[in-house]
Amino acid sequence: MISQIISSFLTFVMILIAVAFLTLIERKVLGYMQLRKGPNIVGPFGLLQPFADGIKLFIKEPLQPSYASIFLFILAPALAISLALILWISLPLPLALSDMNLGLMFILAISSLSVYSLLTSGWASNSKYALMGALRAVAQTISYEVTLGLMIVALTILSGGFDLKLFIDLQNKIWLLFPMWPIFLMWFISTLAETNRSPFDLTEGESELVSGFNVEFSGGLFALFFLAEYANILFMNSLTVVLFMGSSNLSSLYFSASMTMKTMFLIFLFLWVRASYPRFRYDQLMHLMWKNFLPITLSLLIFQFSMSLFFGVSPSAI
């Protein structure tokens, strides 16, 4: 029991350290894409910049709006970072925290709970900008979870279950990225929207909503939202690697190296998209999901069901 707690604690600490360096990589990559250097003052090559930013935020005085609900105001960022870390329990890592038979269902359940942290933060701030940003974030997140859920069902038809280890075994010969490329493209775009990344970062919308649902947060509470957002980005890309790009189960070291390299490649694509595309209009964002992704995903799902019935191959664990 104690060893499990220590293992979980160390895993969460490593995730937060990875998130810290992810922010540095983002600033560096965007800097070079815009023909500038990025952070290069604090430490060698700017490697200590994330820690300097974290210390700066956490030593700031915590301020709350005078009419805010203090309990919910503090609960919202704590809930956000807690859910972002709990999601990692389901991943089939070399030193996995648990062995889940319904890992994908667990991910859907926990990610849907993150909506409450967004809505609570906007409502507890007692600010119209924060509330409007929270409502946008909730509508966007719920909308894209519909297609993400249907894509997961389409993938489980091939794997035969919701256990993530089944996907690793399934992709020993060929990645699902190739036969399922339409679903992969929609999945990648949906993860951009699910994590509120550009060009779907309408929840922040500086030109319209000042800063979105976290406009009233500062110091350590804002840092918790920031850590939760980047932990979710890291997790969604890791999940994409497991679902579509497979990994070898030859050894733990090879698995870790392979998964890290593929995850970093997907994160680079996230940053490339951010540097290349302007923000969508909100109605375009909703039309993309409800009028494009949803019908296509349903059609592919029905096609896969019909093919499995036609050839008499029915997954045993669905």
From Swiss-Prot:
Which residue windows are transmembrane per the record?
5-25, 69-89, 102-122, 148-168, 174-194, 215-235, 253-273, 293-313
Q: Which UniProt keywords apply?
A: Electron transport, Membrane, Mitochondrion, Mitochondrion inner membrane, NAD, Respiratory chain, Translocase, Transmembrane, Transmembrane helix, Transport, Ubiquinone
For this chain's UniProt record, which GO biological process terms are given?
aerobic respiration
Q: Write out the annotated subcellular location.
A: Mitochondrion inner membrane
Disulphide bonds annotated for this chain are none
Where is this protein chiefly located? mitochondrion
Lipid bilayer topology: Multi-pass membrane protein
Q: Which domain of life is it from?
A: Eukaryota
Q: What is its EC number?
A: 7.1.1.2
Query: Looking at the keywords, is Mitochondrion present?
Result: yes
Q: Which GO terms describe its cellular component?
A: mitochondrial inner membrane
Q: Which InterPro entries match?
A: NADH_UbQ_OxRdtase_su1/FPO (IPR001694), NADH_UbQ_OxRdtase_su1_CS (IPR018086)
- GO molecular-function term, one example from the UniProt record: NADH dehydrogenase (ubiquinone) activity
Catalytic reaction annotation: a ubiquinone + NADH + 5 H(+)(in) = a ubiquinol + NAD(+) + 4 H(+)(out)
Family the entry assigns: Belongs to the complex I subunit 1 family.
Annotated function:
Core subunit of the mitochondrial membrane respiratory chain NADH dehydrogenase (Complex I) that is believed to belong to the minimal assembly required for catalysis. Complex I functions in the transfer of electrons from NADH to the respiratory chain. The immediate electron acceptor for the enzyme is believed to be ubiquinone.
Designated name of the protein: NADH-ubiquinone oxidoreductase chain 1
